[in-house]
């Protein structure tokens, strides 16, 4: 009989159910759960406007990737109004620090902005693409490359990366085939594990 394991993260509206008895949850926070943390979050949410809550769900693209005239994307006004939850594909420790300082100085709610980037095959040190790495079957080298990318990107102020891409490529016309490990499910799962461990 299939076992049902329930992991309650003590958030009223989120429940995660894992049906596979062999599934292990890794990367759990070692921080203790405290009533003070619950009170802090509930108090913060009660003071936020609907607009600010929606803003925390908004992800903007960094200015460096835009062409043409300045738009509403990632404007100082959005930051000051607390409407930027995260920013994708913006780099450089100084740039990230400047944006975060502006956010903490001018926004009413003072929730730090999360910075993310597509770190698919390295950050400053560029490695072969994931599809090319998968051809090697060298899981130790793939794990080392992921670890180096994680160290470099976190040192630059990035909080999370949009990697690894673990989709199994079944159609060569798909534009993101090169970001994954190919069409083999066994190899793809082993490479995904190596990248996450890295």
Predicted regions and their residues:
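N-terminal beta-rich core of secreted/periplasmic extracellular enzymes
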Residues: 26-198
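Ligand-recognition surfaces built from glycine- and aromatic
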Residues: 1-25
């Amino acid at each position: 009989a299939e076992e049902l394991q329930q992991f309650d993260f003590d958030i009223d509206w989120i429940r995660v159910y894992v049906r596979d008895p062999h599934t292990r949850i890794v990367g759990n926070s070692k921080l203790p759960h405290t009533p003070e943390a619950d009170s802090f979050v509930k108090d913060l949410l009660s003071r936020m406007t609907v607009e600010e809550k929606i803003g925390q769900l908004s992800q903007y693209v960094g200015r460096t990737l835009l062409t043409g005239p300045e738009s509403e994307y990632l404007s100082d006004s959005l930051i000051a109004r607390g409407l930027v939850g995260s920013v994708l594909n913006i780099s450089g420790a100084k740039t990230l620090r400047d944006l975060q300082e502006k956010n903490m100085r001018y926004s009413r709610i003072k929730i730090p902005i999360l910075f993310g980037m597509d770190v698919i095959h390295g950050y400053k040190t560029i490695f072969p693409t994931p599809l090319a790495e998968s051809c090697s079957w060298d899981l130790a080298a793939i794990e080392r490359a992921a670890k180096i990318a994680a160290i470099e990107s976190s040192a630059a102020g990035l909080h999370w990366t949009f990697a690894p891409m673990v989709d199994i490529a079944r159609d060569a016309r798909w534009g993101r085939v090169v970001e994954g490990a190919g069409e083999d499910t066994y190899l793809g799962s082993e490479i995904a594990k190596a990248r996450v461990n890295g």
